[in-house]
From Swiss-Prot:
<protein>
    <recommendedName>
        <fullName>Phosphatidylinositol 3,4,5-trisphosphate-dependent Rac exchanger 2 protein</fullName>
    </recommendedName>
</protein>
<keyword id="KW-0677">Repeat</keyword>
<dbReference type="InterPro" id="IPR001849">
    <property type="entry name" value="PH_domain"/>
</dbReference>
<dbReference type="Pfam" id="PF00610">
    <property type="entry name" value="DEP"/>
</dbReference>
<dbReference type="GO" id="GO:0005829">
    <property type="term" value="C:cytosol"/>
</dbReference>
<dbReference type="GO" id="GO:0043491">
    <property type="term" value="P:phosphatidylinositol 3-kinase/protein kinase B signal transduction"/>
</dbReference>
<dbReference type="InterPro" id="IPR036034">
    <property type="entry name" value="PDZ_sf"/>
</dbReference>
<dbReference type="InterPro" id="IPR001331">
    <property type="entry name" value="GDS_CDC24_CS"/>
</dbReference>
<dbReference type="GO" id="GO:0030291">
    <property type="term" value="F:protein serine/threonine kinase inhibitor activity"/>
</dbReference>
<dbReference type="InterPro" id="IPR055251">
    <property type="entry name" value="SOS1_NGEF_PH"/>
</dbReference>
<dbReference type="Pfam" id="PF00595">
    <property type="entry name" value="PDZ"/>
</dbReference>
<dbReference type="InterPro" id="IPR051832">
    <property type="entry name" value="mTOR-Rac_regulators"/>
</dbReference>
<dbReference type="Pfam" id="PF22697">
    <property type="entry name" value="SOS1_NGEF_PH"/>
</dbReference>
<dbReference type="InterPro" id="IPR001478">
    <property type="entry name" value="PDZ"/>
</dbReference>
<dbReference type="InterPro" id="IPR035899">
    <property type="entry name" value="DBL_dom_sf"/>
</dbReference>
<dbReference type="InterPro" id="IPR000219">
    <property type="entry name" value="DH_dom"/>
</dbReference>
<dbReference type="InterPro" id="IPR037367">
    <property type="entry name" value="Rex2_DEP_1"/>
</dbReference>
Length: 1606
């Protein structure tokens, strides 16, 4: 080697040495810096958590925080801190004043190697600590406490949770070998520290190897470090600094900047790295194996990485025109750069997507959970501090600064000092952290919004005090607002979103950003352009819309933007296959719902696993499962809302065991077929079933444990064929003959012991009555209800027999089938969500109508009975008018009797009706029929959503699974090994009922009007007023007569001896128990009615009140009477004025007890007389006299009042009687009662006569018809939502921080106290005559519906009918109809106490009407436009919704122990009503829609551009108030389908994380492939009357364009 070459070599080695030493300094600096950070973390753990938890454990504030808990969580963390403080001190001494290449640190590690063994205890305890913390995090108070500790410690709350801090010591001890390895690599062999570092490396490896947990961690980190060593040109921090494991790796094609390159991608937790594979020339050499394998090309932090699917065949801007197959886009949001990746196969793409979603789920779930929990904790703490500061008095007050007064504010310095005083914090810096957290979370703010929180003389104010507090999370706010905005934009008759030509290219369905901003401001959504621009950016960030070329953010410029959902709708983004996140159909379902109760620790059935699906293996004879209709071999779809057919079989077993342990009844969705063949073996004990009816005959009852039940025959099934012969049109007797013809055993035994299960509760009750009343063998009247076993042999000749058979084969049609579809989608948080959409025919549909008709018939019968008293009017009717009067009465009463007869007949027919189980839309004119009282096409649309329960307090699909916080695979093994434990799930049910609008208009009357037109406003009210006045007068009259009898009894008993008096009081007069005293002396007191109150239709005037305030004048006279009695009694008994027959003992005196009773009776009597007098003087009586004066020209109201006044002046006359002659009081009272009866009877007759005039038979029939239709649909809709709440599956808004069981309980409390809100949505077009009449009929039906109340009773323990959780009963009159819900005992116990005790509640119906086409230019009547007519309906409904909301707020205010301060009270109620805090915006929108319809047509202005937006907004408004929903159109088919599917998609997007871009895609899938398809099939002859000009939101999506077209 030459001198020159040696010199060059030495120079090069010198450079290498210099570089090596320079890197050594970097490693030493890193060691020192990370050690300082680590000690800081340990100090934070000890001061912020350990010390505070020790204080909490010592004070025993929370039973969950004990000294053992704290020890288990933190182990010997304080000892570790002490060691590391010392270690840090030694390291810093070695590296003083700053690190350089010659300094030595190896000896530091050698000195502390034994002390580091202290980690053994901590690491071995860590797994227990993790499990404990996981359990503690489920307790809300503990979670809040831990977040508070972190906050006061000053750490940013969403960075790292406590579990992250607890794992830090393990990560640190494992990091030392890696640091020492790197240090050794950078230390020359001749360096004085080399040997010490090498020894320290081996020592620290030994320390880690002796600790199992640390060893595992170290091995994982070593693998990552080894991997990084093979990357040439690595940039950025080491992989071990941010990552702990590799999740996925593989070769992908990367398209960026117009180039297609093959790259190797590596996905870690928190990082995506891509490299170029390095080509090696010497493939077999050792150097090539040990050297670099890859060239570093880039890295993306997954925190700023977004992934978007690309459909096969797509070629766009980001793919540089290249066609993408098996590809997806990756967006680096930090640099705003995009590139496209392509996998080799669809399976590989799926694997990458799963890995990316899993990584995002883990990271986002942790962050979202922390954010939500922190916000809740801060808001609660802010409210608590606010109340305390208000009570303090001198902290929050008006303060002056520079001639300006700032109201209700406080000083930052005073706030921190006060927190120290009350012990909320321990150090001033904690107060600063708390103040800043309150400011960042929107609880307080600087009065001029110029400063963060500082403990100085700066003014701050709670946002409660200036109305700027917004309790909702920003992300959900954008989601719900975005969904609302999308629907409104696509509800316009003049679209804002439309195709646009721009630079020689047509862009479909786009809107310019500046035009959208104009629209938002014009609509009132935003006040300024800046606010609108921020909203637009939020929409883009949350996946609603994007720039058409992906080149710009949302700006106030003429830039084209498109909603993602419109791409799906146009078909432009759906060429070949659907995307991963969209709503996909998993399975079509034809099933029936079974209700199975546990009995003696068993449900009575067993399952087996066949092809990964649970199949019924066995059904126990006579069990509840057999009674419900379980059959061997059937597939089970769902149990209690859980889709068990998608679970592993061992999980299904665990799920059933947990249900059995909780004694829950099972709601099982089991597969079935519309038509089945059942083979029943012949038996000596009989076939075990009964049939009823004909054309077709129906299985009336099946015996439990019989051969029929075992074969799979169920009550309600329709018999189509017997032994292959069609009998669907045969008579009842013929069907029985076919069944019995082929049997061997004609006279079965043991029939009395059979326990029958019936088709309906009415059938069961009817049979029970027959069995009790009818002697054996009596077959009279039983032609349509005959037991198969008892058929007479003469029918045998009617059957075609091919010899005797071993079984009877029945082909039957199943009833109450549920047609459904199971969907799945990946939510915005990456969670797999499952949806079951079903369309259900309500059970008990016809029998409920029958019971309502029965109640109406009874009410009419009672009215007819009352009309018999009309003859008393003959005294005041002139002779020449009496014939007219008699003819009028007889004619009207005859019509009433005909109606009563018809209703009873219809009721009988409906009770026996079994097929079909729903009422189809009519296509032909038909005479009046019983089914005309049933709602047409009434179906309940049920959508059940289920997904894994999340870690966030919010509980919505925006979070992720709790277990995703665990980062190692060891937890998965634990999870699979734990038997009986399933990951928690969320189950929520949404119900919407659809029907044809109520109508009493026959199809032949094309130009007829509806009831609202035919009946005047005063007519509607007058009838109710008269009926209520009748009831009040009769009730008051009974009370008066009862008082008279009691006074007679009490005063007559005084004439007996004391001994007899005691007997009398024991025998005739009931003893005064506490309850009776309360009833007589407290409840029956004064009832003073003002004249203007008697027409109040909502409240009973004559009601019991616990107040004597209205009776002072009466009490004076009563008091004087009792005092006179007691003082004059002796002298009176000894006077000569006594009758000769009245021989009384000298010792008789009126006891105080008797005085009290007489006092109470008189007081009650006087109050009733006052009430009756006021009623007789009221406006209703004036109107009745005026209406009937043509029959009594000689006696009008004036004559009646002149005669009444002197005879009913009760207080004056009776006071005189009491003073002058108290012992003649009984006769005075009787005279008064007779006079009252006389006047009441006269008024009663006039009222009845007036009512007879109103009883137009045709109008009332029509009114009853639409009322029945509406009430039946209302009861069915409410029943489904009620059962969802009782099954703890109701939640009207997942935006609130509430579990479903709590939301269900709260809704039940809400309806028990405020009543139930019913939202009726009309899609009728009032410009069409028949639909206008329907709308008018509906208005009157809803008016009558307000008089209905709901009550609840427990049903019988032993059910006679299968799969019916509740039945109905109707009682009362048209003015006060009561519907009773009979509920099984398990569900009855879930009701609020008030309802269990017999309390009821009212219905609050509201109707929002909006045609799906513009009504401009159409007129209703009297120059009132159709738009104005709809606006009047909607304005009245909005007012009712506001009134209901006020009742709701009042209920929560009464329920809450809220503070006296009105502002803080409002804030408290806002928190209690968290789902309702969007109401102000919704009220504003609905009001603006109504106003826009009433203004003059101004098509070019934004104010009129509401379209049909009212439908979706009013629906959301009512939904947030917990309303039941009923959607109506002319047939209940086409328009209802469009609306209900849209509502379901909106609910999924708003509450369950359906990505916003798939709203229309999901709607379209439900319309074309969902459960509603079956409704169209059931009504094939019904014409689709959806307007052609309906907005695009109510149109089907366009099909994809042909291949090759853009």
């Amino acid at each position: 080697m030459s001198e020159d070459s040696r010199g060059d070599s030495r120079a090069e080695s010198a450079k290498d040495l210099e570089k090596q030493l320079r890197l050594r300094v970097c490693v030493l600096s890193e060691l020192q810096k990370t050690e300082r950070d680590y000690v800081g973390t340990l100090e934070f753990l000890v001061s912020a958590f350990l010390h505070r938890m020790n204080q909490c454990a010592a004070s025993k504030v929370d039973k969950n925080v004990t000294e053992e808990t704290v020890k288990m969580l933190f182990s010997n963390i304080e000892d570790i801190l002490a060691v590391h403080k010392e270690f840090l001190k030694v390291v810093e001494e070695c590296l003083h004043p700053e690190p350089n290449a010659q300094q030595e640190v190896g000896t530091c590690f050698l000195h502390f190697k034994d002390k580091f063994r202290i980690y053994d205890e901590y690491c071995s305890n860590h797994e227990k600590a993790q499990k404990l913390l996981l359990e503690l995090n489920k307790i809300r108070t503990i979670r809040t406490f831990l977040l508070n500790c972190m906050l006061l410690g000053g750490r940013k709350n969403t960075d790292v949770p406590l579990e992250g801090y607890l794992v830090t010591p393990i990560q640190r001890i494992c990091k030392y070998p890696l640091i020492l390895k790197e240090l050794l690599k950078r230390t020359p062999r001749k360096h004085s520290d080399y040997a010490a570092v090498m020894e320290a490396l081996q020592a620290m490896k030994a320390v880690c190897s002796n600790i199992n947990e640390a060893k595992r961690q170290m091995e994982k980190l070593e693998v990552l470090e080894e991997w990084q060593s093979h990357i040439e040109g690595w940039e950025g921090s080491n992989i071990t600094d941010t990552c702990t494991e590799m999740l996925m790796c593989g070769v992908l094609l990367k398209i960026s900047s117009g180039n297609i390159q093959e790259r190797v991608f590596f996905l870690f937790d928190n990082l995506l790295v891509y490299c170029k594979r390095k080509h090696r020339r010497l493939k077999n050499s050792k150097a090539s194996t040990d050297g670099h394998r890859y060239l570093f090309r880039g890295r993306i932090n997954t925190e700023v990485m977004e992934v978007e699917n690309v459909d096969d065949g797509t070629a766009d801007f980001h793919s540089s025109g290249h066609i993408v197959v098996n590809g997806w886009k990756i967006h680096n949001t930090a640099k705003n750069k995009w590139f496209v990746c392509m996998a080799k196969t669809p399976e590989e793409k799926h694997e990458w997507f799963e890995a990316i979603l899993k990584e995002r789920e883990r990271r986002k779930g942790l962050k979202l959970g922390m954010e939500q929990d922190t916000w809740v904790m801060i808001s609660e703490q802010g409210e608590k501090l606010y109340k305390m500061m208000c009570r303090q008095g001198n902290l929050i007050k008006d303060r002056k600064r520079k001639l300006t007064t700032f109201p209700k504010c406080f000083l930052g310095s005073e706030f921190v000092s006060w927190l120290l005083e009350i012990g909320e914090i321990h150090r001033p810096e904690e107060g600063v952290h708390l103040g800043q957290a309150l400011l960042e979370n929107g609880i307080i703010h600087h009065v001029t919004d110029k400063h963060q929180f500082k403990p100085e003389q700066m003014l701050y104010r709670f946002r409660y005090d200036d109305g700027t507090f917004y309790p909702r999370n920003e992300m959900q706010d954008v989601i719900s607002k975005g969904v609302r905005l999308y629907c409104r934009l696509h509800s316009l008759f003049t679209p804002v979103i439309r195709d646009k030509d721009y630079h020689l290219r047509t862009y479909k369905s786009v809107v310019m950003a500046n035009k959208l901003i104009d629209w938002l401001i014009a609509q009132g959504d935003c006040r300024t352009r800046e606010e609108a621009m921020i909203f637009g950016v939020g929409l883009c960030d949350n996946g609603f819309m994007h720039h058409v070329l992906e080149k710009s953010e949302f700006k106030d410029e003429p830039l084209l933007f498109r909603f993602f959902s419109d791409e799906e709708m146009e078909g432009s983004n759906m060429k070949h296959r659907l995307m991963k996140h969209d709503l996909k159909v998993v399975e079509n379902v034809i099933a029936k719902s079974l209700l199975i109760k546990s009995n003696e620790g068993s449900y009575g059935f067993g399952l087996e696993d066949k092809n990964k699906v649970p199949i019924i293996k066995l059904v126990e004879k006579g069990s509840n499962a057999e009674m419900a209709g379980m059959e061997v071999g059937k597939k089970i779809f769902a149990i209690n809302g859980d889709l068990v057919f998608m679970r592993p079989f061992n999980e299904v077993d665990c799920f059933l065991k947990s249900c059995l342990n909780s004694r829950k009844p099972l709601r099982v969705l089991v597969s079935t077929k519309p038509r089945e063949t059942v083979k029943i073996p012949d038996s000596a004990d009989g076939l075990g079933f009964q049939i009823r009816g004909f054309g077709p005959s129906v299985v009336h009852a099946v015996g439990r444990g019989t051969v029929a039940a075992a074969a799979g025959l169920h009550p309600g099934q329709c018999i189509i064929k017997v032994n292959g012969i069609n009998v669907s049109k045969e008579t009842h007797a013929s069907v029985i003959a076919h069944v019995t013809a082929c049997r061997k055993y004609r006279r079965p035994t043991k029939q009395d012991s059979i326990q029958w299960v019936y088709n309906s509760i009415e059938s069961a009750q009817e049979d029970l009555q027959k069995s009790h009343s009818k002697p054996p063998g009596d077959e009279a009247g039983d032609a349509f209800d005959c037991k198969v076993e008892e058929v007479i042999d003469k029918f045998n000749t009617m059957a075609i027999i091919d010899g005797k058979k071993e079984h009877v084969s029945l082909t039957v049609d199943n009833v109450h089938l549920e047609y459904g579809v199971v969907y799945e989608y990946d939510s915005t948080a990456g969670i797999k969500c499952n949806v079951v959409e079903k369309m259900i025919e309500p059970k008990g549909f016809f029998s409920l109508t029958a019971k309502i008709l029965e109640a109406l018939a009874k009410s009419d019968e009672h009215f007819v009975q009352n009309c018999t008293s009309l003859n008393s009017l003959n005294e005041v009717i002139p002779t020449d008018l009496q014939s007219k009067f008699s003819a009028l009465c007889s004619e009207r009463i005859e019509h009433l009797c005909q109606r009563i007869s018809s209703y009873k007949k219809f009721s009988r027919v409906l009770k026996n009706r079994a097929w079909p189980t729903f009422k189809q839309a009519k296509s032909k004119i038909s005479p009046l029929h019983s089914s005309d009282f049933c709602p047409t096409n009434c179906h309940v649309n049920v959508m059940e959503v289920s997904y894994p329960k999340t870690s966030t307090s919010l509980g919505s699909a925006f979070g992720v699974q709790l277990d995703s916080r665990k980062h190692n695979s060891h937890d998965k093994e634990n999870k699979s090994s734990e038997q009986g434990k399933l990951s928690p799930m969320v189950y929520i049910q949404h119900t919407i009922t659809t029907m044809a609008a109520p109508s009493g208009l026959s199809l032949g009357q094309q130009d007829g009007h509806g009831l609202r037109y035919l009946l005047k406003e005063e007519d509607l009210e007058t009838q109710d007023i008269y009926q209520k006045l009748l009831g009040k007068l009769q009730t008051a009259l009974k009370e008066v007569e009862m008082c008279v009898c009691q006074i007679d009894d009490l005063l007559s008993s005084i004439t007996y001896s004391p001994k007899l008096e005691r007997k009398t009081s024991e025998g005739i007069i009931p003893t005064d128990s506490d309850n009776e005293k309360g009833e007589r002396n407290s409840k029956r007191v004064c009832f003073n009615v003002a004249g203007d109150e008697q027409e109040d239709s909502g409240h009973d005037t004559i009601s019991n009140r616990d107040s004597y305030s209205d009776c002072n004048s009466n009490r004076n006279s009563i008091a004087s009477f009792t005092s006179i009695c007691s003082s004059q009694c002796s002298s009176y008994f000894h006077s000569d004025e006594m009758d000769s027959g009245d021989e009384l003992p000298l010792s008789v005196r009126i006891s105080h007890d008797k005085q009290d009773k007489i006092h109470s009776c008189l007081e009650h009597l006087f109050s009733q007389v006052d009430s009756i007098t006021n009623l007789l003087k009221g406006q209703a009586v004036v109107r009745a006299f005026d209406q009937t004066k043509y029959l009594t020209p000689g006696r009008g109201l004036q004559e009646f009042q002149q005669e009444m006044e002197p005879k009913l002046s009760c207080p004056k006359r009776l006071r005189l009687h009491i003073k002058q002659d108290p012992w003649n009081l009984p006769s005075s009272v009787r005279t008064l009662a007779q006079n009252i009866r006389k006047f009441v009877e006269e008024v009663k007759c006039r009222l009845l006569l007036a009512l007879l005039e109103y009883s137009d038979s045709e109008t009332q029939l029509r009114r009853d018809m639409v009322f029945c239709q509406t009430l039946v649909a209302t009861v069915c809709a409410f029943s489904e939502q009620l059962m969802a709440a009782l099954n703890q599956m109701f939640d009207n808004s997942k935006e609130n921080e509430m579990e479903t069981w709590e939301a269900s309980r709260r809704w039940l409390d809400q309806i028990a106290n405020a009543g139930v809100l019913f939202h009726f949505q009309s899609l009728l077009s009032p410009n069409l005559t028949d639909e206008q009449a329907m709308l008018e009929d509906t208005l009157v039906a809803l008016f009558d519906l307000e008089k209905v109340s709901f009550y609840f009773k427990p049903s019988e323990e032993e059910p006679l009918v299968a799969n019916v959780p509740l039945t109905y009963q109707a009682e009362g009159s048209r003015q006060a109809l009561k519907v009773y819900f009979y509920i099984d005992s398990y569900h009855f116990e879930q009701l609020p106490q008030r309802l269990k005790n017999g309390g009821g509640f009212k219905i609050h119906p509201v109707l929002f009407a909006q045609a799906l086409e513009s009504m401009e230019g159409y007129y209703y009547r009297d120059n009132v436009s159709v738009e104005e007519f709809q606006a009047q309906i909607n304005a009245a409904s909005l007012e009712k919704v506001k009134q209901y909301n006020q009742k709701l707020r009042a209920f929560y205010l009464d329920k809450s122990n809220s503070p006296p301060n009105s502002t803080s009270k409002a804030a408290y109620v806002d928190k209690l009503m968290r789902p309702l805090n969007a109401l102000d915006e919704l009220y504003r929108l609905v009001a603006s829609f109504i106003r826009s319809k009433r203004t003059a047509a101004c098509a070019n202005t934004a104010c009129s551009a509401s379209g049909v937006g009212l439908l979706s907004v009013s629906s959301e408004l009512c939904n947030r108030l917990g309303a039941c929903h009923i959607i109506m159109c002319s047939s209940g088919v086409h328009r209802c389908t469009l609306s209900v599917t849209l509502e379901q998609a909106i609910i999924l997007a708003r509450s369950h994380g359906l990505p916003p871009r798939y709203i229309m895609q999901a709607t379209d899938v439900m319309r074309k492939q969902g459960a509603r398809v079956q409704n169209t099939a059931k009504n094939l002859g019904v014409r689709d009357r959806t307007p052609q000009s309906a907005p695009r939101l109510y149109k089907l999506c366009e099909p994809p364009p042909p291949a090759g077209e853009e």
